[in-house]
């Protein structure tokens, strides 16, 4: 044992953290012991641990025989719901104890994150202690549409990503079957998509997570009957003309048939809840439905909620207040006060209409209005982490908005029991993880950023990469250059970055230079991981675009092409496809 290692162990012991001295050295083989009669979820946790280690270093896990390191997984109640304990194992090694299956997966994640993978093998972490989540609603929403990553990537890749998120303590996956992409339930493309969605949700269940469904109040297929369609003028945000009017008797029948088929399809996964959504992309502007949020939409909430509970007994109904105005919110709360059985909770995020919700805004200042959400219903957040001040979404690589996330959380956490960040892809991976730790124990964003960098790249580069993350967030803004529209297909002729002027982007060249130096220090596995590549390419693009007057050169286009491959965005619509020029080919 070298002097540096000995000093570290002495410091840990003096701090009250007791460790097995043998754990300070890297190993290439280890043995995993699972409980007798381990459940399928526990067995899967072991498999996920093995995958994580083998992807990051040249080491492997065995379940029999001799090994240099013993890792034991057990479940023992008494720690606290979904909590865990990591301790030394009698006879040597590490013992990961979960209060339950979710506690075990979270504890496994903590052990993996505090270990090292860059010293010629696996160096087990020395963190010891107990951790219990302070909030039970710790989820993520995948926007499974527009041919984004969740819509197009190989299913196994997405399943692994779900497992990655579970290791950070997330316990629920919410998805949306966006019907406007298809023509009917038996549309071959719809059948294929539902199979894919089911496999993704099944992966969440296998790792101990719940699943939930998001539905539009007046959901419709792309070929909905013209005579049943909604009147224009009732939508806010995204809107498609195929939406159906629920005030027409046949329109409500159409909606319930569509959603009933969906509930039957998902019933075997036992969805924990159904979220019913008002705007973006629902709505109807007819006299019987206006104002949509408090009138037509509430008809849908009653009938769709009743159907969901009938088809999937035990499921909870959550009402979304997304894009409702203050008058609509007040009316909805009054109706919920009169009908206590209508819903089981609310989905609300103060960054949409902070003055209306009373939950605060994203500028770190609490909302000054008296809260309108007054019916003693649990409220979960829905922070938007994908689209803020950028276009195309994820078009320039990683978008770490960790300081903004801290501001969102500070302003709204007192009114929330947890939340579900809104995700359009993997480019905001770091921001997702920051939110996972807000929900777990209110850990500050800066601490989570350090933990993420140490785990995904190396503990030795934490300070350098954390500084780059700050620079990237500081220089996060819309971009535009002449001719950008050529070859970029858009829906609804929408291009929010149009005519944006180049900005100063201070520190962009230095950040890229730092990333180049760090790249040379990383293991082969770390430097070729998608998490590193998207962060590296973002720094490259910021630097190149700054020095090139804001317009892309061939170096930028090569970066765009690589991002398209990482995100499987070859068929994505222009809002989420990196802006590679039409017919560009590498020289």
Task: Kindly give the residue locations of the regions a language model identified.
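Positively charged n-region of N-terminal signal peptides that target proteins for export
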Residues: 1-7
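Catalytic domains of carbohydrate-active enzymes, especially glycoside hydrolases
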Residues: 156-178
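Catalytic-core regions of glycoside hydrolase
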Residues: 117-120, 145, 171, 178, ...
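N-terminal small/glycine-rich loop or linker at the start of catalytic domains
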Residues: 128-149, 230, 235-240
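Bacterial N-terminal signal peptides
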Residues: 7-17
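Solvent-exposed, acidic/flexible segments
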Residues: 35-46, 101-104, 151-158, 190-194, ...
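Contiguous, structured surface segment used for ligand recognition
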Residues: 23-138
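C-terminal non-catalytic alpha-helical accessory regions
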Residues: 423-428, 444-587
């Amino acid at each position: 044992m070298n002097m540096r290692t000995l000093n570290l162990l002495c410091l840990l012991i003096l701090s009250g953290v007791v460790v097995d001295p043998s754990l300070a050295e890297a190993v290439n083989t280890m043995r995993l012991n699972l409980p007798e009669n381990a459940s399928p979820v526990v067995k899967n946790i072991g498999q996920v641990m093995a995958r994580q280690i083998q992807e990051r270093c040249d080491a492997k896990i065995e379940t029999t025989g001799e090994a240099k390191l013993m890792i034991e997984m057990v479940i023992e109640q008494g720690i606290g719901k979904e909590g865990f304990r990591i301790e030394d194992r009698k006879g040597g090694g590490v013992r990961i104890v979960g209060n339950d299956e979710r506690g075990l997966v979270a504890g496994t994640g903590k052990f993996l994150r505090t270990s090292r993978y860059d010293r010629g093998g696996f160096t087990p972490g020395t963190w010891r202690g107990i951790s219990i989540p302070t909030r039970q609603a710790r989820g993520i929403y995948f926007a499974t549409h527009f041919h984004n990553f969740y819509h197009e990537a190989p299913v196994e890749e997405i399943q692994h990503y779900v497992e990655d998120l579970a290791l950070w303590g997330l316990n629920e996956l919410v998805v949306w079957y966006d019907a406007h992409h298809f023509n009917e339930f038996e549309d071959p493309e719809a059948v294929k998509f539902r199979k894919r969605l089911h496999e993704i949700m099944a992966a969440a269940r296998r790792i101990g997570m719940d699943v939930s469904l998001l539905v539009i109040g007046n959901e419709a297929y792309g070929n909905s009957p013209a005579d049943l369609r909604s009147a224009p003028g009732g939508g806010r945000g995204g809107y498609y003309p195929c939406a159906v009017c629920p005030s027409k008797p046949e329109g409500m029948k159409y909606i319930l048939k569509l959603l009933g088929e969906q509930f039957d399809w998902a019933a075997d996964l036992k969805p924990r809840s159904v979220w019913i959504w008002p705007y973006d992309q629902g709505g109807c502007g007819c006299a019987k439905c206006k104002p949509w949020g408090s009138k037509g939409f509430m008809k849908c909430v009653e009938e769709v909620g009743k159907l969901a509970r009938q088809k999937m007994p035990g499921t909870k109904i959550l009402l979304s207040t997304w894009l409702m105005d203050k008058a609509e919110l007040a009316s909805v709360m009054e109706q919920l006060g009169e009908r206590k059985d209508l819903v089981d909770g609310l989905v609300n995020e103060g960054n949409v209409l902070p003055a209306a919700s009373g939950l605060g805004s994203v500028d770190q200042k609490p909302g000054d209005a008296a809260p309108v959400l007054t019916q003693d219903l649990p409220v979960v957040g829905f922070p938007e982490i994908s689209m803020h001040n950028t276009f195309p979404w994820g078009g320039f690589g990683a978008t770490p908005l960790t300081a903004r996330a801290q501001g969102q959380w500070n302003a709204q956490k007192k009114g929330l029991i947890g939340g579900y960040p809104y995700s359009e892809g993997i480019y905001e991976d770091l921001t997702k993880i920051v939110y996972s730790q807000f929900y777990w124990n209110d850990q500050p964003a800066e601490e989570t950023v350090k933990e993420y960098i140490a785990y995904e790249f190396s503990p030795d580069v934490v300070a350098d990469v954390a500084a780059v993350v700050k620079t990237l967030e500081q220089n996060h803004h819309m971009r535009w250059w002449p001719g950008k529209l050529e070859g970029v297909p858009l829906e609804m002729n929408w291009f929010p970055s149009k005519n944006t002027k180049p900005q100063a982007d201070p520190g962009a060249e230095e950040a890229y230079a730092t990333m180049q130096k760090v790249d040379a220090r990383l293991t082969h596995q770390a430097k070729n991981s998608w998490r590193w590549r998207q962060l590296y390419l973002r720094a490259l693009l910021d630097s190149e675009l700054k020095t090139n007057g804001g317009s892309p050169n061939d170096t930028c286009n090569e970066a765009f092409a690589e991002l398209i491959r990482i995100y499987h965005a070859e068929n994505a619509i222009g809002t989420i496809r990196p802006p590679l020029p039409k017919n560009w080919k590498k020289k």
